[in-house]
Regions:
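Bacterial N-terminal signal peptides that target proteins for export
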Residues: 1-10
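Bacterial signal peptide processing site
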Residues: 22-25
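Alpha-helical segments in soluble extracytoplasmic regions
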Residues: 31-159
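C-terminal motif of bacterial Sec signal peptides marking the signal peptidase cleavage site
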Residues: 17-20
Length: 160
């Protein structure tokens, strides 16, 4: 059962990477980024989030290790959300950018119950938290935003 839960979490991490996330620099002065600048911005943090959640692609050696990995992942999600909130995206993806930033921040917050359960080394709480994440709207909202960006011709990291 623990393996299924970890597989679900790994799928969440992969889906986040596929969703594409913000990156550092540019566009914070109110001047909209160009499409190419914005695509580069998305690619940068997408890679950071992929790297942060990579350890979750295999079952962790312990719940303590899982808690540590989740903490890093949460930090990357929050950083990406902050980056997205700090830039001026191209006009045609302003709403998508806001939805993606909100989705990433919300998901980072929602992962706290899982991280806390893992830190307590309580498998039953971990499973309960994983079940709660399965019904999260944050990932769905972020995915909808990136799907819309793709329809508008944006390349999101190496995943489009």
């Amino acid at each position: 059962m623990r393996h299924r839960g970890v597989a679900t979490l790994a799928a969440l991490g992969f889906a986040l990477a596929v969703a594409g996330c913000g990156g550092g620099g540019g566009g914070g002065d109110g001047t909209p980024l160009t499409k190419a600048q914005y695509e580069q911005h998305l690619a940068t943090d997408s890679q950071a989030i992929t790297k942060a959640f990579q350890p979750l692609s295999t079952p962790p050696s312990s719940l303590s290790v899982l808690a540590s990995q989740l903490k890093v992942g949460q930090e990357k999600l929050r950083s990406a959300a902050d980056d997205l909130n700090g830039v001026t995206p191209p006009k045609d993806v302003e709403k998508d950018n806001q939805a993606l930033a909100k989705g990433l921040q919300t998901l980072a917050d929602e992962l706290e119950s899982l991280r806390s359960a893992a830190a307590k080394k309580d498998p039953a709480l971990v499973q309960k938290a994983l079940n709660g994440l399965k019904s999260s709207h944050a990932l769905v909202d972020a995915r909808a935003a990136t799907d819309d960006m793709r329809k508008k011709g944006y390349k999101l990291g190496g995943f489009s």
